[in-house]
Amino acid sequence: MKRIEVSERTDRQLMTSSLHDLAIAMEQDLWEIKLAHRPKSFWYPYSTLHNIAVLEKLSATAGLHLLDLCRGVHGKVADIGAADGDLAFFLEKHGLSVDVIDNEYTNFNGLAGARTVKEALNSSVVIRSVDLDSQFALPHQKYDALFFLGTLYHLKNPFFLLESLARITKYCFVSTRIAKQTADGQSLSPYPVAYLLGPQECNNDDTNFWIFSDHGLKRLIERTGWNLLSYVTIGDTAGSTPADPKRDERAFCLLEKRPPSLSARPNPVPAGDGPGKTTVSWDTADGSIGKIFVSINGDQEVLFADGRRGTAPAHWIEAGSNYEFRFYNSDHTELLAKVAVTRATQ
């Protein structure tokens, strides 16, 4: 297959151009590559790199820089629901290691487009076909950031997906269609709800399922283990409906994984006669199972409690001893949090 290089730009251009400007320039380069291999009808028809401007705005609103938040300890980001991979190839050009994750059976061209561009660019982007409506396993265990744009409403179980993503990344960009009212004018905005589309109701596409209200999307985000750092809507922000292409509203969000929590109250345990008592509370935040172990005076730790979230009493706290409660993931390979408990002597 013929390889075509994306045009190189000088360091001065990189410093003086916004990421959005660079993205639009690269989109033009990518179209040259695409049309050199297949006719226009073969390729995903919508622009994905125009979203860079919104992603930059979300990042700045949260006091972050788009590329900086992608450069973390895991050395990897992923573009989920990637169409032809334009965003992934753009991020790779800016020094990131990227996975493309999409379902070849629902992707616009069966991921053949992304694979064609990958070969033409001699890219190192990893392309994986994953059915996100299954009990999936992603190809790289942990990511610094995920890009999950325009895909949520194509999934049968958005709750499961967002909860699963919270277990493998710190940051996640999400965009999806939302609606302020039904087609006949009934208001959805005040309620945390989602509208289930008919199979041909929206864009004649039976892979469209759930259109959330603004309040419903924010409730979903909170319930699946995320903090909402920034949020913006574009399109018909006054009278959007679930299916009308002329009344289309999109929400863009920057999410941060909510950290696991572990606490003991009271701590220190008040002095008194007999053993003292504290109540240990925990929450994994992402729906996974956690395990609480306790070590007394530095001795071998023993299992104290387990579960997604809960409380348990420790009614054997003695003065002069130190109790360290340690919160692990389900297979005891990652320490999520810890708290030291003591008892007052008087």
What are these regions (language model features)?
Residues V130, Y231-I234, R265:
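Conserved beta-strand termini and adjacent loop/short-helix elements that scaffold enzyme active sites
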